[in-house]
């Protein structure tokens, strides 16, 4: 009959006996069956093929003949005892090497190996003197009984205190039948509490030890550490003390960059750029730190607080990770480089929403509905990302990594570029944490919606490098250079430092050139190393509008001025470098060199041989060579914009030069206009139809100015530019100055200027305009909120042909819902929403407060916006982007100026906020 494997481990029937009703301890020792599991099996020794009876007999024989060896049947004992350390278990002593009747704990390792080369097992029982088989059985049974009682007690009170465990130990030691062996604690749940005590009973012996042997058997003192420190675990109590000591000693050393980026707060008072940073010196700036900064900026509306918050982040970047300063600045400006590089993300809302849907596992329609409800694709992306959990999250995003990915997206071209862009965007969203997805989505859409204008970012940068000067060796010594100054002195000092950076940026509006110099030489020496030079486009000087000749005379009453034709064309800034290379830039610093190959070919013959380098400010105007007259602006817009072949040019252009900014290595921006004009005419030569000086008139006579204005209109010009010649006549880069005034024919009966507005919607026509658009909803651009705010409904100024043309061209821009950044408030919703990408020039009779339209709301009146009265379409501005449209601040300024003139308060004109 075949037997099961378990039957070999069951006690024989002869060994079993019925227990009496009352048993004595001795009877328990005599009658209790042997254990069910052998120690060999617990030690992973393969059972031999002998029967259980033979194996039991052999074990008994070994007990009688082996020194200090106990029986193997004690299943309960290992759960209570502390096992011997790993080093001792791996090298058990040979019975021949240990002296008789001596409980030795450590035997020489060479003798621990059997002749066959296998290590011998070793237990605590092998250290005991020889015993008889009867004593062994009695001790084993008694040990099992006590162990069972102790285990039961431990299960009832698993969290026994240290003192109670010590009492148990002392009580058992007094009985004289206990040998304590310090060893590694077991991992069984029952022994968790006991491992907290230092000396717990392990095994019992039936032999009384001599006094010397008892001393040897006592556990070593707590501080002695006789066992190997590598294999012996530290006691939990000691470990806790060590942790506390270590944390106390390292706390001061690890205060730099120890915060979680999710808790980073750059808006805190008394910010320390090193101790309050969330990364350490030499590490890359976490993108989450930038996102947290944007969050704090978004929470406040005060400009000074916004500048301070961004400045604190920049201080930490300067002190800890200077190479990341440039990416942080570009992402704060929502740019990828200087304008002349032409790097744009080119990610539409459709692609962005698809990427969010695929990265988060949500349905596209659900995301679109949520965007329509919340009006912010960034918040939708953040909420979608926060609901997804990943088993293996990607590494955290860094500012340099995100910036590099954005640049990769901008450089991708070709038929497969959209799929590649989608993959990059999805990868970014998958790696996002917390609010990172919000600002990734907003950056990709082109609108951060922080209210951080360029001047605010420059102010924050100037403040950062002033308080925490760059170039210091770490650890940074000066973290707050303004410490010790009074509040007023500190404010004035920071303003002076800010002016240094702003003036330098006006002449060199290229952070790629400014930041390396700033980090190496500091802000004070920045003007020495960053100077105006050909090849870097400048922001042009702009003019303020006026409403009549009388206003011009009042402003320039005591100074000499000149009147120049205002040509209707495109601003062209001509740069010629020392090596002869020619660059042509637009008013927005875009590189238009490829658009004008015909102009490049003319450069050698329009300058004198002595001229080696220069920067000219000109107007490129469409020119009819046959009729020798200026053509309308609309003709110029039909010219191809990129990669133009000179042989295919149909629309010819003529350059009208009106200013000289740089000549032969010398900047002329601080020279008066009279000197600049003189140098222009001395060093350049006119060529009819190709290069001509602007027509001008120097006079103070009212009648002459009026006649000159009429003549400019007859010569196909917009009007006049009136400029001071000597007093306050420097070239003010990137500034709309009162020293240059615009005087147009239309201004005499209007508000003083036309407005460039964005088309955001269209109304279906009725009557004779049925079947096409009859009206349009226009909006101004608000720089702070980065919104397009509705300002008026436009329906006049169009010919039938223009209406048909607009209807056809705008069909491709129809949207089911408005863009999130479009705000109309109480205005009548259009029949068709349009993608806000078209800019129109509009003229109006007047401006008025409006409870319906949101444009400039809060700037003039707390509750009302501003609208146009009798608006009229003038032309399409193909040279302008929506962000370059008339701003809400400009609308408010036009309204105030109109009110001042009506109330004859022209003296207050100087209070207008200038764009500096």
From Swiss-Prot:
One of its GO terms (molecular function) is metal ion binding. The modification Phosphothreonine is found at residues 77, 193, 232, 796. Its EC number is 6.5.1.1. GO terms for biological process: cell division; DNA biosynthetic process; DNA recombination; DNA repair; DNA replication; double-strand break repair via nonhomologous end joining; response to hydrogen peroxide. It is an enzyme of class 6 (ligase). Residues 13-43, 153-177, 238-257 have a biased composition (Basic and acidic residues). PANTHER family: DNA LIGASE 1, DNA LIGASE 1/3 FAMILY MEMBER. This is DNA ligase 1. It comes from Mus musculus (Mouse).
């Amino acid at each position: 009959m075949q037997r099961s494997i378990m039957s070999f481990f069951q006690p024989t029937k002869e060994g079993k006996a019925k227990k009496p009703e009352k048993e004595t301890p001795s009877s328990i020792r005599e009658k209790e069956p042997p254990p069910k599991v052998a120690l060999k099996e617990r030690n992973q020794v393969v059972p031999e093929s002998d029967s259980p009876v033979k194996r039991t007999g052999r074990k008994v024989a070994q007990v009688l003949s082996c020194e200090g060896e106990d029986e193997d049947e004690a299943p309960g004992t290992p759960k209570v005892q502390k096992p011997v350390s790993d080093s001792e278990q791996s090298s058990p002593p040979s019975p021949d090497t240990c002296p008789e009747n001596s409980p030795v704990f450590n035997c020489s390792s060479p003798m621990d190996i059997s002749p066959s080369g296998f290590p011998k097992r070793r237990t605590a029982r092998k250290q005991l003197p020889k015993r008889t088989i009867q004593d062994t059985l009695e001790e084993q049974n008694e040990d099992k009984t006590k162990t069972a009682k102790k285990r039961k007690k431990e299960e009832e009170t698993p969290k026994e205190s240290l003192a109670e465990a010590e009492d148990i130990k002392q009580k058992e030691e007094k009985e004289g039948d206990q040998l304590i062996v310090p060893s590694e604690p077991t991992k069984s749940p029952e022994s968790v509490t006991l491992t907290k005590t230092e000396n717990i009973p392990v095994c019992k012996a039936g032999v009384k030890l001599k006094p010397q042997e008892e001393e040897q058997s006592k556990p070593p003192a707590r501080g002695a550490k006789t066992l190997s420190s590598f294999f012996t675990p530290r006691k939990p109590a000691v470990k806790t003390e060590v942790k506390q000591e270590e944390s106390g000693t390292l706390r001061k050393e690890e205060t730099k960059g120890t915060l979680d980026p999710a808790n980073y707060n750059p808006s805190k008072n008394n910010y320390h750029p090193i101790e309050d940073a969330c990364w350490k010196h030499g590490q890359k700036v976490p993108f989450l730190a930038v996102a947290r900064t944007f969050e704090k900026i978004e929470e406040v509306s005060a400009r000074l607080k916004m500048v301070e918050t961004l400045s604190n982040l920049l201080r930490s970047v300067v002190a800890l990770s200077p190479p990341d300063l440039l990416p942080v600045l570009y992402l704060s400006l929502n740019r990828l480089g200087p304008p002349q590089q032409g790097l744009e993300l080119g990610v539409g809302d459709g692609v962005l929403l698809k990427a969010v849907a695929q990265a988060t596992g949500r349905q596209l329609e659900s995301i679109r509905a949520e965007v329509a409800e919340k009006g912010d694709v960034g918040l939708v992306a953040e909420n979608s990302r926060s609901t997804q959990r990943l088993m293996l999250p990607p590494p955290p995003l860094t500012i340099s990594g995100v910036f590099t990915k954005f640049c990769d997206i901008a450089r991708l071209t070709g038929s497969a570029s959209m799929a590649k862009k989608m993959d990059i965007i999805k990868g970014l969203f998958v790696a996002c944490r917390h609010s990172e997805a919000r600002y990734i989505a907003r950056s990709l859409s082109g609108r951060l919606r922080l209210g951080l204008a360029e001047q605010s970012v420059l102010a924050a940068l100037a403040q950062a490098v002033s308080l925490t000067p760059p170039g210091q060796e770490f650890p940074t010594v000066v973290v707050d250079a303004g410490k010790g100054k009074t509040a007023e002195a500190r404010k004035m000092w920071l303003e002076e430092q800010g002016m240094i950076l702003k003036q330098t940026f006006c002449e060199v509006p290229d952070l790629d050139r400014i930041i390396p110099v700033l980090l190496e030489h500091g802000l004070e020496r920045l003007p020495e190393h960053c100077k105006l030079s050909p090849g870097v486009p400048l922001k042009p000087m702009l003019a303020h509008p006026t409403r009549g000749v009388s206003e011009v005379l009042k402003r320039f009453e005591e100074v000499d001025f000149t009147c120049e034709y205002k040509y209707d064309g495109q601003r062209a800034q001509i740069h010629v470098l020392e090596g002869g290379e020619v660059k042509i830039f637009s008013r927005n610093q875009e590189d238009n060199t490829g658009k004008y190959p015909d102009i490049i070919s003319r450069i050698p013959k329009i300058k004198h041989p002595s001229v080696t380098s220069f920067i000219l400010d000109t107007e490129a105007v469409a020119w009819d060579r046959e009729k020798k007259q200026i053509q309308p602006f609309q003709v110029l817009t039909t010219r191809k914009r990129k990669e133009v072949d000179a042989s295919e040019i149909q629309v010819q252009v003529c350059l009208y030069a009106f200013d000289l900014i740089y000549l032969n290595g010398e900047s002329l921006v601080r020279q008066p206009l009279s000197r600049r004009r003189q140098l222009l005419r001395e060093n350049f030569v006119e060529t009819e139809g190709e290069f001509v000086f602007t027509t001008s008139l120097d006079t103070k006579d009212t009648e002459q100015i009026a006649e000159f204005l009429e003549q400019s209109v007859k010569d196909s010009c917009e009007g006049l530019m009136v400029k001071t010649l000597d007093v306050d006549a420097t070239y003010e880069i990137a500034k709309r100055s009162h020293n240059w005034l615009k005087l147009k024919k239309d201004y005499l009966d209007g508000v003083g200027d036309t407005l460039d507005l964005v088309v955001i919607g269209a109304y279906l026509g009725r009557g004779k305009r049925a079947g096409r658009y009859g009206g349009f909803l226009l909006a101004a651009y608000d720089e702070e909120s980065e919104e397009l705010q509705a300002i008026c409904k436009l329906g006049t100024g169009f010919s039938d042909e223009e209406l048909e043309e607009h209807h056809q061209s705008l069909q491709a821009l129809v949207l089911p819902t408005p863009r999130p950044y479009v705000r109309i408030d109480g205005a009548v919703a259009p029949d068709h929403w349009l993608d806000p990408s078209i800019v129109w020039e509009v003229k109006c009779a007047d401006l008025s407060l409006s409870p319906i339209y949101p444009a400039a709301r809060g700037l003039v009146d707390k509750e009302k916006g501003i609208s146009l009265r009798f608006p009229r379409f003038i032309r399409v501005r193909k040279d302008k982007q929506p962000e370059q449209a008339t701003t809400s601040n400009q609308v408010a300024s036009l309204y105030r100026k109109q009110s001042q003139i009506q109330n004859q308060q022209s003296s207050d004109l100087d209070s207008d906020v200038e764009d500096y």
